[in-house]
């Protein structure tokens, strides 16, 4: 049937449309940010997100001749650069949302300043394999 033949294409088209919408609106919102440092930090995150989506769905971009191999290679290099540029701001960006470490299931941003000690405690207490066996 038509649904069976077009089903995969429809899913891919709707996924592409959703990502387009998110990238477009992310860009619009980032450009409205007045604080220069915040706009710069979130601009990098925006660019990384857009590049990740292009890389993730590169087959579609190549099939439609929307991207060249040279551009694709450049995007992969830019992605690596963005990782390095975003890294210093990563903790601040996560903390800005105000999620607790418990919600994030992470001790890296521990408000008590002991992320490594907390990670070790979580590892010890989160799995029965890490608990000593008690024999009666």
At which residue positions do the language-model features occur?
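Flavin-dependent oxidoreductase catalytic core characteristic
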Residues: 1-136
């Amino acid at each position: 049937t038509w649904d069976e033949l077009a089903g995969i294409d429809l899913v891919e088209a709707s996924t592409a449309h959703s990502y387009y919408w998110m990238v477009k609106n992310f860009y619009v919102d980032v450009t409205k940010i007045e604080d220069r440092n915040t706009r710069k930090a979130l601009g990098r995150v925006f660019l990384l997100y857009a590049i990740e989506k292009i890389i993730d769905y590169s087959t579609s971009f190549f099939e439609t001749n929307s991207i060249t191999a040279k551009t694709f290679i450049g995007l992969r290099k830019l992605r690596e650069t963005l990782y390095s540029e975003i890294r210093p701001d990563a903790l601040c960006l996560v903390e800005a949302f105000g999620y607790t470490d418990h919600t994030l299931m992470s001790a890296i941003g521990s408000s008590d300043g002991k992320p490594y000690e907390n990670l070790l405690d979580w590892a010890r207490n989160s799995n029965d394999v890490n608990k000593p066996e008690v024999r009666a």
